[in-house]
Amino acid sequence: MLINWFKLISPKNRILKRATLAAKQVDALKDEMRALSDEQLFNKTEYFINELKNNKTTDDILVEAFAVIREVVYRETGNFAYLVQLIGAYVVHQGDFSEMMTGEGKTLTLVLAAYLNMLEKKGVHIVTVNEYLAERDAEQARRIFARLNLTVGCNKANLAPHLKKEAFDCDLTYTTNSELGFDYLRDNMVRNYRDKKIRGLHFAIVDEGDSILIDEARTPLIISGQPKKDFRMYFDADKFVETLSESDYKIDPESRSPSLTEKGITKAEKHFKINNLFDLENSDLFHKIGNALTARKIFQNGKEYIVRDDKILIVDHFTGRILEGRSYNGGLHQAVQAKERVPIEAENVVVATVTYQSFFRMYKKLAAVSGTALTESEEFLKIYNMVVVPVPTNRPVIRKDHPDFMFGNLKTKWEAVVNEIEKIHKTGQPILVGTGSVEDSETLHQMLLEKNIMHEVLNAKNHAREAHIIAKAGEVGSVTISTNMAGRGTDIKLGKGAKELGGLYVIGTERHESRRIDNQLRGRSGRQGDIGESRFFISFGDPLFKRFAQDRILKAQEKLASDYFDSKFFSRFLTMTQKKVESVNFDMRKNLIDYDHVLANQRELIYKQRDKILIASDLTEVVDRMAQNFVEGFVETFKDQANQTMVNPIELSIAVQKELLQGEEVTASQFYNQTLLAAKQTVLKLVKDAISKKIEVMTVGIANNVFRDIIIQQMDDAWIHHLDQMLKLREGVSLRSLEQTSPLNIYVEESKKLFDLMLNKIAKNVILAVCAIINPTRNVDINVEQEHRRLEALKRLEEIKKLEELQNNNNEPAKVLFKFPDQHGNMIEREVPVDNLIQLVDGQIIQAQVAEEPKQELNQLEKADQLDQTLIEAKLAEQQEQKNNSATDK
């Protein structure tokens, strides 16, 4: 994602000013557009497309295009976009975050912005939080764009692959964030490029952007493979953690991450009978103990998860919804299962993974809309390069937000909440109560039952009735308890007579860690200028105070009576605390992206290379490059121990023959007296020649398909292993925090080494697999003793050649000391004239071994390859005996 440096110095007000000016220019064209016939209006789309083809930009045609689509929407649906919707559409088109209050018409705003970008014919994605919204909005958009010859698709789970491809080939595609992310991962696992579904990541508009880009930013999308089935260690770790006392571990109150103290570490080493918990061989045990600590000391049943039918179901921290089909990764889910004593599911191997942060940053242009984003504006700018621009409401917000009620303890707070509900309920004013957890909603539910107050409960345990419950939440006399679930994808409309009673009354039972979530709850009331009110009930027993309370707050708590009080000091303290928590959470997400950026770059390199392999018409050059890469490291392992610049010819020849050429004859003499560089060139030539011969037999087309299958398989296998190694590195790097280098720097350095190892492994396995198809059925039978004799003969021949040169220089007969057996079989030494030995080598022996090809000229290496030391000695003795009947010693 490219950084727009202008945004770093451009405040939201400046963007809003430009957006307002553009909206007024669009509005000035409404009469002109209204005067056009349907045919004239609809033909404008083709005109815009041609303008863009003629080097115009979308900004050049923005005003007229917005005016056209505004009129088209009016003629098709009867809805005429407000000025604020035009402003919001401008902000979205510019790739920024449009903050629009509930009920301000975000759906139509997205249609306006999408139309302008659809004209580029590169595809626009509108991302929603659930399939219901995606289908609903896609159907509405389809009716509008059909008249303009523009296509609209809806990508859903369980669609057939060809239907998914059709959806993504449309000019506009509605999809959920999770299905879009998984389709991206699946696209990078296909074996045929034509099977890819997403044609490109051009422009995405994220509806409820704060939920997807902030709340779920750290959520990894994971495609799993074959599971790991060793369950014993999960129970062992859980049983150990059960034995710990409070002095054995500590919990960071800000990050909520547990860790063992020195005492706990000692106890663990004694319990598991190991010397050092931090040894690499114990990294898996350390990881499982950490997960067990989180499951036992941090996670609570009814808050982070619920147990249903012996299954662990994750509860969304922000919405209270059950995250269907989700599980904690890295073995944490299994740790929770061990804690709850439910059947442990196998921990899957990660085949492909990406976080929402990394995925959405890959789009060339990214924009978002939501009712609450301003409090996270710094994060959106730094991570997603989006300026949050608050768009004015079409009508003034007249909701009354009352000061918080604060209490000394939980018991008094809940009693006050029930009393407030009872009092307001008697008037008939509709009430929406937001709780922080499923457990709190169940507690309040029981208290209201005791008061005989009729109400509905909306939480993770009955989410199936969500639409029905929300539909009645604005009716007179209704009381609805919700775990923040009403804040996403819902619109509470006031029933008949509710306005006269004061509109929807929102009660918050605790302040959330993020002010944004509090604002979402408040925003359920007062939509489109409706009357309404809100109030929060807070106590020092709330989670926010427990985690971040200061000493003075705790001291004040001891002095306070149980009655509620209104204090500006505590309100300011609460706001400061929320800002502090938001900052901590931002730092955690920023830290995540620092680490994730490393893996994201590696993922991008692998996926791009994978695509090139899939579409290449000739992979010979790719295989040749891999062969060169592999041979470099392969030959290095056969250095001669006595001389590191030379190779060991026997070991290298055997390895080449066994591992690479599958039985093709390779002799040690081919590498005799070769440097590493020369040996690399020799091996590379042997491999390339063998591959070329195979291509000639198979034909280029067939060979290309074979190479593609081999390369893709090896890349996928190596990438899966690499992901596992990176996960272990990420978990283990914190163990080295005592070093002077930062954990992130260590992670960067080590990850590069792992990536290089993976690339080398891919090259090695590809070449070995390619070589295996060259001569797959040949048996390798190497006579090592014979190779030694050949090398010895080669050395002798070199000595002979040197002596021959010496003889030529000195004009004196050169002699060499030679061992041979006498007539009694005893080994003796004799100085033999070089001429005799040269004659012997060039004559009798060579002729005897190449009798069938007497005219063939052999070079010295080929001669040496055929020499047998024993034969030389025997022939030498025979020749001397014929010349001189008695041998004389010197």
Swiss-Prot record:
Looking at the keywords, is Disulfide bond present? no
Which reaction does this enzyme catalyse, per its entry? Answer: ATP + H2O + cellular proteinSide 1 = ADP + phosphate + cellular proteinSide 2
Q: Name one GO molecular function term.
A: protein-exporting ATPase activity
Location comes to: Cell membrane; Cytoplasm
Q: Indicate whether Phosphoprotein appears among the record's keywords.
A: no
Please give the InterPro entries that the UniProt record associates with this protein: Helicase_ATP-bd (IPR014001), Helicase_C-like (IPR001650), P-loop_NTPase (IPR027417), SecA (IPR000185), SecA_CS (IPR020937), SecA_DEAD (IPR011115), SecA_motor_DEAD (IPR014018), SecA_preprotein_X-link_dom (IPR011130)
Q: Principal localization?
A: membrane
Q: Which UniProt keywords apply?
A: ATP-binding, Cell membrane, Cytoplasm, Membrane, Nucleotide-binding, Protein transport, Translocase, Translocation, Transport
Q: According to the UniProt entry, what is the EC number of this protein?
A: 7.4.2.8
The record gives the membrane topology as: Peripheral membrane protein
State any GO BP term from the record.
Answer: protein targeting
Residues bound to ATP are Q85, G103, E104, G105, K106, T107, D491
GO CC field: cell envelope Sec protein transport complex; cytosol; plasma membrane
Q: Which NCBIfam families match?
A: secA (TIGR00963)
What quaternary arrangement does the UniProt entry report? Monomer and homodimer. Part of the essential Sec protein translocation apparatus which comprises SecA, SecYEG and auxiliary proteins SecDF. Other proteins may also be involved.
Biological function: Part of the Sec protein translocase complex. Interacts with the SecYEG preprotein conducting channel. Has a central role in coupling the hydrolysis of ATP to the transfer of proteins into and across the cell membrane, serving as an ATP-driven molecular motor driving the stepwise translocation of polypeptide chains across the membrane.
Q: Family, per the entry?
A: Belongs to the SecA family.
Descriptive protein name = Protein translocase subunit SecA
